[in-house]
UniProtKB/Swiss-Prot annotation:
Gene3D superfamilies: Glycogen Phosphorylase B. One of its GO terms (molecular function) is alpha-1,4-glucan glucosyltransferase (ADP-glucose donor) activity. HAMAP family: Glycogen_synth (MF_00484). One of its GO terms (biological process) is glycogen biosynthetic process. ADP-alpha-D-glucose binds at K15. Its EC number is 2.4.1.21. Keywords: Glycogen biosynthesis, Glycosyltransferase, Transferase. It catalyses: [(1->4)-alpha-D-glucosyl](n) + ADP-alpha-D-glucose = [(1->4)-alpha-D-glucosyl](n+1) + ADP + H(+). Pfam families: Glyco_transf_5, Glycos_transf_1. This is Glycogen synthase. GO terms for cellular component: cytosol. Belongs to the glycosyltransferase 1 family. Bacterial/plant glycogen synthase subfamily. Pathway: Glycan biosynthesis; glycogen biosynthesis.
Length: 480
């Protein structure tokens, strides 16, 4: 079975969000279970630098100009690079310039990604033809539209990592990307009078996946559907919409061999966790108190992530003698809000604006509780890291957070099911009460260690996800 993943990021070469982490792990896990998986993505500077040895597969001109398709390998995984310097030779973020303006030619840059993915199912590489083209997020959404326009020579799967980003462009660009005007209608590419690359992926694919079962349900509702809930409800009723959880890359995220932390540990030997807590407190110049309940948050600073809820309820942590460290960047008013907290309570709250991979690992290894109070969260990865590292997740019951964390109620603790703290409503009081519950459990260390042990025993490996996708591909291929 030959599967081509079409995407715009690949960890660790280029990352702006969780999509890169998925692409840096899922294809490798699929190879381990016998799938011939490859990736196609634009040859951004960081990608070319990370895969310097390539051969030319094809050279051609199309609607996007002169294109060279190259093939190389990254850690043994086959990767096609779409080499078009006039489109992709731009340093930094792959989607926008340094002033956060989307590139004006994004419609063409990402149409080309979808077009090449479809062509790789029909002979663009004479040595390898994809049986399944698996596109990820709006950037690759047109792949299934091009396949549809070619008579569906391969099966197509589209994964929604975040429905909020829809890739919408003016109608007049349709003639510039090689698709017929007849595809621009409500049963097709059209959304609110524009071309939607995300809707193309939803409408024309043979199957659509969301990155957790709960998120797959949520996006069929007006609250989470972003105007597409009608289409998604139809797909769900047709059996075309499924939720498959993301996994954790054990090679990168495991407390017993994490390359970024000095003190390793595992379930039966937890001394290293205490030492990481000391190191984290020292890094942020907080009192090195082993008895202080240490909360950590590694996130984009946005309302989606519930950062405003934390700002409004952080005094509960202060009042109960806890500590809070935050790493992230985002909305200026939220950055200002958490910096104000740190100035107000310098011995209990510390903040670093920006992103630091090594520090993120230390925070997840050294913290006692990881905060993920998101308003919505398609899957979420940090709570999975928290489980693996024995840093109990405190989450809102949404998306993948609801699928992966079990609330520490008395009954769940007795049944050895509890793995963290869960609150329902996206408001200050609900989060504050969850913080109170965390402090209450912290006072009962024997029970805390029980919950922590159950958390660390959870298995959210990529092998499970890869097996789920394999079953989906097999089902589609059996429909020939």
């Amino acid at each position: 079975m030959k599967v081509l993943h079409a995407c715009s990021e690949l960890y660790p070469l280029l990352k702006t969000g969780g999509l890169a982490d998925v692409m840096g792990a899922l294809p490798f896990a699929q190879k381990e279970i016998g799938i011939d998986a490859r990736i196609v993505l634009p040859a951004y500077p960081a990608i070319k630098a990370g895969i310097p040895e390539t051969t030319v597969v094809s050279e051609f001109d199309n609607f996007a100009g002169h294109i060279v398709l190259r093939y190389g390998e990254y850690k043994g995984l086959g990767v096609y690079l779409i080499d078009a310097p006039h489109l992709y030779q731009r340093e930094g973020n792959p989607y926008h310039d340094q002033w956060y303006n989307d590139y004006a030619d994004n419609y063409k840059r990402f149409a080309l990604l979808g077009w090449v993915a479809a062509e790789l199912a029909t002979g663009l590489d004479s040595w390898w033809h994809a049986d399944v083209v698996h596109a990820h997020d709006w950037h690759a959404g047109l792949a299934s539209a091009y396949l549809f326009n070619k008579g569906r020579p391969a099966k197509s799967v589209f994964t929604i990592h975040n429905l909020a980003y829809q890739g919408q462009f003016a109608y007049h660009h349709l003639v510039e990307i090689g698709l017929p005007a007849g595809m621009f209608h409500v049963d097709g590419l059209e959304l609110h009078g524009q071309i939607s690359y995300l809707k193309a992926g939803l409408y024309y694919s043979d199957a659509v996946t969301a990155v957790s079962p709960t998120y797959a349900k949520e996006i069929t509702t007006p609250e989470f559907g972003y105007g597409l809930q009608g289409l998604l409800t139809t797909l769900n009723s047709q059996g075309k919409l499924v939720g498959i959880l993301n996994g954790v890359d054990d090679q990168i995220w495991h407390p017993n061999h994490d390359a970024y932390i000095e003190h390793h540990y595992k379930l039966k030997a937890m001394t290293g966790k205490r030492k990481n807590k000391e190191a984290l407190q020292a890094y942020f110049n907080l009192p090195q108190d082993p008895d202080a309940l240490l909360f950590v948050m590694v996130t984009r600073l946005t309302e989606q992530k519930g950062v405003d809820l934390l700002i409004d309820s952080a005094e509960e942590i202060v009042k109960q003698g806890g500590q809070l460290t935050i790493l992230g960047s985002g909305s200026p008013h939220l950055e200002a809000g958490i910096l104000h907290l740190a100035q107000q309570y310098p011995h209990q709250i510390a903040v670093k604006i920006g992103y630091d991979e090594a520090l993120s690992h230390l925070m997840i290894a050294g913290g006692d509780v990881i905060l993920v109070p998101s308003r919505f969260e398609p899957c979420g990865l940090t709570q999975l890291y928290g489980l693996k590292y024995g840093t109990l997740p405190l989450v809102r019951a949404t998306g993948g957070l609801a699928d992966t964390v079990v609330n520490a109620t008395v009954e769940n603790i007795k049944s050895r099911l509890a793995t963290g703290f869960v609150f329902e409503q996206a408001n200050r009081e609900a989060l504050r009460q969850a913080l109170v519950n965390a402090f209450a459990l912290w006072q009962k260390q024997r029970l805390w260690f029980t919950v922590r042990s159950v958390a660390m025993e959870q298995d959210f490996s990529w092998q499970i996800s890869a097996t789920g996708y394999h079953a989906l591909y097999q089902r589609l291929l059996s429909f020939n």
